[in-house]
C-alpha cells in the first residue's frame, strides 16, 4: 500500500511550502492540509489518497521530456487489480551502490521546484546561488535569503555518485566514509585575479572525492586539463538541454546558446592557465557516467 508513505512525504512538504502544484486548487492536497491541521484522521487521509492521490502520478511517471522511457519500473494494473505491479527494473535500482543517494537527490529537485512555485515564479526564472561554507543552494528575495537544498544533493544526479574527475564512488550521505566535497572546477583562488567567470557559480561547481579535492596529488590551485574542461562542458550542456531546475541559472552564468557557452569556457580556461600556469589531471578509478 503506497498511500501512507506517499501522503507522508507530501504532508511534510506541505508544511514547508503549501504550493505543490501549478494549478490553483486540488481536492487531494486540501485534504492533506486538513490532516496537517488535525481536522481529519490518518485512516481517512489514507483512503482519500487511494482515491485521489495517484490519478495523474502513475500515468506521468514514465514520461520524461515528452517521451516514454524504455525501462518501466511498474505496470499499471489498476483496472484489473486496483494497483500496480513492480518490475525487475525497479528492484535492480536497489542493487546499485549509489541507491543510498536516491532519496537525497529526489528531495533536492523537489525543493528547487516547490521553492519556485512558492515565490510565484516559473522554475526557469529562479536564480540559484551557492553558499560555499554551508554547501547550500539558496535564493535571494526581497524578503531575504531562502535556503533551498544541499548543493551536494542537487549536483549528484548528473554524476551518478561518481567523482567528477576520477570516477571513483562518492556519497552524499552524511557521515559516509566516501562523503564527497563540493569543488570549484576552476580554483576559488581565481576570485581575486580578474577572472571572467563567477567562480562560485553553479556552472563551476562539481562533486569530487577527497583525494582529488585535497589529497596527495589533488587539484588544489591547478587548472584542470582540456579533457576535463570538455567534461565540464558536457555536464553543463546536460543541465541546459534538460528541464532540470538549475538550467536557467547555468545559462544566465555561461551563455544562452551553445556557441556562447563554448566561448565562455574557453575564455575562462585561457585566463586560468595564464594566471595559475600548471595543469592537472588524474587517472580514472572507475568508468565514466
Model-predicted segments: where are they?
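Short, charged low-complexity linear segments at domain edges
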Residues: 129-148, 176-194
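Short secondary-structure junctions and interdomain/linker hinges
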Residues: 17, 162, 239-240
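C-terminal structured domain segments
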Residues: 221-289
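Mixed-charge, low-complexity interaction segments
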Residues: 1-147, 223-235
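Histidine-centered nuclease catalytic patch
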Residues: 167-205, 218-231
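Short cysteine-rich loop/turn motifs with clustered Cys
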Residues: 149-181, 209-212
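Conserved aromatic-histidine-acidic binding/catalytic patches
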Residues: 2, 143, 147-154, 158, ...
Amino acid at each position: 500500500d503506497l498511500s501512507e508513505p506517499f501522503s507522508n512525504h507530501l504532508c511534510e512538504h506541505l508544511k514547508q511550502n503549501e504550493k505543490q502544484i501549478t494549478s490553483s486548487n486540488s481536492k487531494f492536497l486540501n485534504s492533506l492540509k486538513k490532516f496537517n491541521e488535525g481536522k481529519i484522521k490518518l485512516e481517512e487521509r489514507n483512503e482519500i489518497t487511494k482515491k485521489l492521490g495517484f490519478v495523474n502520478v502513475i500515468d506521468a511517471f514514465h514520461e520524461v521530456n515528452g517521451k516514454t522511457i524504455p525501462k518501466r519500473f511498474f505496470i499499471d494494473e489498476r483496472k484489473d487489480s486496483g494497483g500496480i505491479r513492480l518490475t525487475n527494473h525497479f528492484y535492480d535500482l536497489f542493487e546499485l551502490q549509489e541507491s543510498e543517494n536516491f532519496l537525497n537527490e529526489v528531495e533536492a529537485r523537489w525543493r528547487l521546484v516547490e521553492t519556485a512555485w512558492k515565490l510565484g515564479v516559473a522554475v526557469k526564472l529562479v536564480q540559484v546561488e551557492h553558499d560555499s561554507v554551508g554547501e547550500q543552494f539558496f535564493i535571494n528575495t526581497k524578503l531575504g535569503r531562502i535556503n533551498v537544498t544541499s548543493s551536494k544533493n542537487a549536483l549528484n544526479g548528473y554524476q551518478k555518485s561518481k567523482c567528477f574527475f576520477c570516477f571513483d564512488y562518492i556519497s552524499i550521505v552524511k557521515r559516509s566514509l566516501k562523503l564527497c566535497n563540493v569543488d570549484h572546477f576552476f580554483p576559488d583562488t581565481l576570485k581575486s585575479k580578474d577572472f571572467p567567470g563567477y567562480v562560485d557559480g553553479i556552472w563551476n561547481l562539481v562533486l569530487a572525492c577527497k583525494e582529488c579535492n585535497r589529497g596527495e596529488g589533488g587539484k588544489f590551485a591547478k587548472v584542470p586539463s582540456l579533457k576535463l574542461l570538455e567534461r565540464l562542458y558536457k555536464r553543463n550542456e546536460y543541465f541546459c538541454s534538460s528541464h532540470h531546475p538549475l538550467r536557467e541559472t547555468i545559462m544566465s552564468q555561461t551563455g544562452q546558446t551553445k556557441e556562447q557557452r563554448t566561448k565562455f569556457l574557453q575564455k575562462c580556461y585561457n585566463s586560468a592557465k595564464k594566471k595559475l600556469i600548471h595543469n592537472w589531471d588524474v587517472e580514472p578509478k572507475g568508468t565514466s557516467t
